[in-house]
Regions:
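Substrate-binding cleft and catalytic face of glycoside hydrolase catalytic domains
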Residues: 81-244, 250-253
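Aromatic/acidic polysaccharide-binding cleft in carbohydrate-active enzymes
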Residues: 288-400
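Bacterial Sec-dependent N-terminal signal peptides
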Residues: 1-23
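Carbohydrate-binding surface patches
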Residues: 389-450, 492
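Solvent-exposed beta-hairpin/edge-strand motifs
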Residues: 444-465
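C-terminal beta-strand-rich structural cap/linker in extracellular carbohydrate-active enzymes
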Residues: 465-504
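Noncatalytic carbohydrate-binding groove/subsite architecture in carbohydrate-active enzymes
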Residues: 191-324, 336
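N-terminal carbohydrate-binding accessory modules
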Residues: 21-88, 100, 115-123, 203-206
Length: 504
């Protein structure tokens, strides 16, 4: 998506005012992938999902990880990939699974996945890790594993990467090196060592595929000191040009709470490579709580709060010009492969169990379909800012908004490249997503907004609603909305032309 860099912190201080007739939908959230969202507006349709074949490009990536360790089964979920609408999928190539005998690569399992994905219109983002125990000190095969260190292991690694790129360079254009080198209490993978591994791997990829886009770093949580040391090595060796982006994974309970931390990471990277992008390379929320299932276990999650979290993360990243990858397509059986995670990881968009079967799509699958259907490269981000004064003069093209609450809202705006019609994303961003559809009616005024026929869209359910003439008006450069239901899941106020719909 063609966008402009802007970090938006949205805090206004006008009195809280729940308007008469505010929606208080206290229905329990539906499980089983269905939404019970209801408001007082007239529903006129639903967001029409789009297949990846119908989308040229977008900001999104989808996690299809752990296939190299048989924690999930691609055959079980492959039919769900195209209809989701996210073109790029993250895969791990699995050195240890592919080279079980020295010098012999069995590509059959990976060929099957990559060939099928490409045939479906998907674009693999392929990671070269993990290590391989058939060589001395060649690293481990799981999350938190040490990287290869011995000369023999590094030579074998080089051969592996070269063989991998030669085989898939006509089908894979995006690559990644090593997953979460700083995970947990890992002290083996120093930033300097991992920087050197990233450089040697990227040089092999670029030699064989000069047009390749390579993601570096891929750290498991934002550690600014680790990142600084990593970037410094690459910069001092003059190798930053090898990398398209630096990836990070930062799991936080409130998906809107870490924008400041990402901005700090951006400032560190800017010291060394201001043109290298950041990519949020892995994130997602569980669909129920409990420790031992990976990150974010200490919360009573539901399918509804998972759907809110994932879509807030996606749209929050989009609003800050950060590419976003969501983990993952299906629940993963981590316990089967000696991972530090000992239970089923339930961050999947599809429910699974210990047999790795695909049982059904969760609510988050459908909610992310709605995001993918609307937000593609036909839109560009607008630098929208809050204002207290709706009568203040604006520069040409400047867009501002006002809200009748001192509660914090996330508000981002986008404009169609050709028609210049606009869509605004809005949600309450103060807290961890809850398990309720309860909304609060709010008044919103947009200055210089370009919307002729406004509709209200609930991203979670996909419902598209008419905003009646009694609830909106144009007054000069002001577009004024009254009694708009807002909650902690994303809603849109959009020009109707930007929302592909289907009948109920």
């Amino acid at each position: 998506m063609k966008t402009y860099w802007f970090i938006l912190f949205v805090f206004a201080s006008i009195s809280v005012s729940a308007q008469p007739g505010a929606t208080t939908n206290n229905q329990p959230p539906a499980e089983g992938g269905k939404s019970t969202f209801t408001i007082g507006l007239k529903q006129v349709g639903s967001v029409k999902p789009r297949n990846v074949r119908d989308i040229e490009a977008s900001n999104w990536l989808l996690g299809c990880e752990t296939l190299d360790r048989d924690m999930a089964d691609y055959e079980q979920y492959k039919e769900y990939l195209g209809p989701l609408g996210i073109k790029r999928i993250r895969l791990q190539a699995g050195w240890a699974k592919t080279e079980k005998v020295r010098g012999q690569y069995d590509w059959a399992w990976l060929d099957r996945i990559i060939n099928d994905a490409v045939q479906r219109g998907l674009e693999p983002w392929l990671e070269t890790s993990y290590g391989n125990p058939i060589y001395p000190k060649a690293g481990g095969i799981n999350l938190g594993a040490g990287a290869p260190t011995s000369p023999e292991a590094l030579a074998a690694w080089d051969r592996w990467v070269e063989a991998l790129v030669k085989r898939y360079k006509d089908k894979v254009n995006e690559w990644e090196v090593w997953n979460e080198p700083n995970f947990g209490d890992n002290t083996i993978n120093s930033p300097e060592m991992i920087a050197d591994l990233n450089i040697r791997t990227a040089e092999i990829i670029k030699r064989l595929q000069p047009s390749a886009k390579i993601s570096g770093l891929s750290m498991g949580h934002i550690d600014l000191d680790y990142a600084d040391a990593f970037f410094k090595v690459i910069h001092e060796k003059g190798k930053m040009k090898l990398f398209d982006n630096m990836a990070y994974h930062d799991y936080v309970y409130n998906p809107d709470a870490n924008h400041w931390h990402v901005a700090e990471l951006r400032r560190v990277l800017d010291k060394y490579a201001p043109t290298v992008k950041l990519r949020q390379g892995e994130n997602g929320a569980p669909s129920f709580g409990g420790f031992g299932r990976g990150a974010l276990g200490d919360w009573e999650w539901s399918e509804l709060s998972q759907a809110k979290w994932n879509t807030r993360r996606m749209l929050g990243n989009l609003g800050h010009d950060i590419e976003c990858s969501i983990l993952g397509i299906i629940d993963m059986n981590y316990a089967s492969a000696g991972s530090p995670i000992k239970k089923l990881n339930v961050k999947g968009l599809i429910e699974s169990d210990s047999t790795r079967r695909a049982i059904r799509p969760k609510l988050a699958y459908h909610a992310m379909q709605h995001v993918a259907a609307i937000f593609d490269n036909s839109l560009r981000r607008l630098p929208v800012r809050p204002t207290y004064n709706v009568n203040a003069p604006l520069a040409p093209g400047e867009v501002k908004y006002n809200k009748n609450t001192d509660r914090s809202l996330a508000v981002y705006g986008y404009e169609h490249n050709n028609s210049k019609k606009q869509v605004y994303t809005i949600w309450m961003d103060e807290c961890i997503p809850n398990n309720s559809y309860q909304t609060r009616d709010m008044n919103l005024t947009f200055l210089n907004a370009n919307i002729d026929q406004p509709v209200y869209v609930d991203i979670i359910s996909g419902g598209v609603y008419e905003i009646p003439a009694s609830q909106w008006k144009k007054d000069g450069n002001k577009l004024i909305f009254q009694n708009i239901p807002v909650y902690d899941g994303p809603i849109l106020i959009a020009d109707k032309s930007l929302i592909g719909t289907r009948n109920q």
